[in-house]
Amino acid sequence: MATCIWLRSCGARRLGSTFPGCRLRPRAGGLVPASGPAPGPAQLRCYAGGLAGLSAALLRTDSFVGGRWLPAAATFPVQDPASGAALGMVADCGVREARAAVRAAYEAFCRWREVSAKERSSLLRKWYNLMIQNKDDLARIITAESGKPLKEAHGEILYSAFFLEWFSEEARRVYGDIIYTPAKDRRALVLKQPXGVAAVITPWNFPSAMITRKVGAALAAGCTVVVKPAEDTPFSALALAELASQAGIPSGVYNVIPCSRKNAKEVGEAICTDPLVSKISFTGSTTTGKILLHHAANSVKRVSMELGGLAPFIVFDSANVDQAVAGAMASKFRNTGQTCVCSNQFLVQRGIHDAFVKAFAEAMKKNLRVGNGFEEGTTQGPLINEKAVEKVEKQVNDAVSKGATVVTGGKRHQLGKNFFEPTLLCNVTQDMLCTHEETFGPLAPVIKFDTEEEAIAIANAADVGLAGYFYSQDPAQIWRVAEQLEVGMVGVNEGLISSVECPFGGVKQSGLGREGSKYGIDEYLELKYVCYGGL
């Protein structure tokens, strides 16, 4: 069984001086925080202190396949992004484990698809109830492995659980059709049937919600799943597995195979090319999505892709400045700018530009506090790793070298290598990296524009189209712009648009299909036409 590296006999000696703040001790079935405060500067302590008192059953480190917790031949470390300290060692699954998980899921599918919609609904509801009962522990796991501020982590757990609740209800609403044909002696039926085993590959920025948004729909439809969570945040996926087991979800219906970054490519390829897999659902970068699409093409598998974005945030002269700033703060700085629907470029009309920039800068200075995600008052945690920080830093330096002005922020934060100051740039032009590369960090570049047509042209120039936002008090303009923006989701005078009841997805290279809402379950259902003759 994989254990916390701090207390593995050889690991403690090797890593003790490198990660002095991590003080977890192993207990059968998971990791348990050691007693006593973690040493070191308060702002850089390992998140182990925030895990004190956590249910040992939720801190799993092995893979979950066929209803059993299984070790792998190797393990990999999961790190606290705030300090770099290791939280624990997790099973590093390879191709062999991936194929075993697919087979377990396929065997379970042969039984699960026969389970009544009412029973599937009941089991999903039990899973939801367990998430709500354990919401505090689940939130702390998210903060520990991703750095997300605890308040936001609590919000994610509720959002995550609501997908299970929603799809528990949708499970009983999978209806077919009866079609009357021109021939009097025939009747046509349209059945909706589960597609089969779904390979689910999820990101680190929402390590719980991105799983339940996919898995809730899949299980409601009668599919089974193999989840490959992001290597940075496997603990959330494994905690969900424990709760699924407690809820009575049958063995093999929900499987989790964590793996290291080194093994991620081959494991992803293995589950996406396995002939027993019928469906692939992926949330992540457009680059990786294209690779998975290539794998799916060889066997023509059904695919759902939620990929990168370059969300424009447009502020027209008629906008209410205070409302626009509030929306900008919510859209840009949630999860320290690490969301796929995060505003990436701010297009502000000339007449309101100066007032907006001034108010935006003041709001950032007043309301944003960088720190450890477990500390009360923190609104901006660390970025997931130093590579993410380097990307933000590169974009800022590129913009400044080409004439942009730093209004506030602009550099790494003194707290540590994975922290970056919330940054506002003005005098930004379209030749700068930050206007055509997804940042995934706390950088807000402002471009000044003159006409509505100019703003639409800039926004639609991107080859991706996930989300877009704009602020206006002109009713005619609102209709025009909402219809003309080439994105899958539009926020009109609103910076937070995600909801379990509404379809989530993009156009162009931002993906295929929709998740959540009444449409989400259709991604896991096949239509079958049955013709009855001789009547």
UniProtKB/Swiss-Prot annotation:
Q: What is its main location?
A: mitochondrion
- Tell me which residues form the transit peptide: 1-47
Listed InterPro entries: Ald_DH/histidinol_DH, Ald_DH_C, Ald_DH_CS_CYS, Ald_DH_CS_GLU, Ald_DH_N, Aldehyde_DH_dom, Aldehyde_DH_Superfamily, Succ_semiAld_DH
In this chain, where does the modification N6-succinyllysine occur? K126, K135, K184, K265, K402
Sites binding NAD(+) sit at R213, K228, P229, A230, E231, G284, S285, T286, T287, T288, G289
Q: Pinpoint the site Transition state stabilizer.
A: N205
Which positions bear N6-acetyllysine? K126, K265, K365, K411
Catalytic residues (positions):
E306, C340
Give the location in the cell.
Mitochondrion
- The first-level EC class reads oxidoreductase
Q: List the disulfide bonds.
A: C340-C342
The metabolic or biological pathway listed in the UniProt record of this protein is:
Amino-acid degradation; 4-aminobutanoate degradation
One GO CC term, this protein: mitochondrion
| Biological process according to GO | central nervous system development; gamma-aminobutyric acid catabolic process; succinate metabolic process
Write down which residues bear the modification named Phosphoserine: S499
What does the record give as EC number? Answer: 1.2.1.24
The residues that the entry says bind substrate are R213, R334, S498
Cited PROSITE patterns:
ALDEHYDE_DEHYDR_CYS, ALDEHYDE_DEHYDR_GLU
- Keyword field: Acetylation, Disulfide bond, Mitochondrion, NAD, Oxidoreductase, Phosphoprotein, Transit peptide
Subunit structure as annotated in this protein's UniProt entry: Homotetramer.
Free-text function comment from the UniProt entry? Catalyzes one step in the degradation of the inhibitory neurotransmitter gamma-aminobutyric acid (GABA).
**What does the sequence similarity comment in the record state about its family?**
Belongs to the aldehyde dehydrogenase family.
**Under which name does UniProt file this protein?**
Succinate-semialdehyde dehydrogenase, mitochondrial
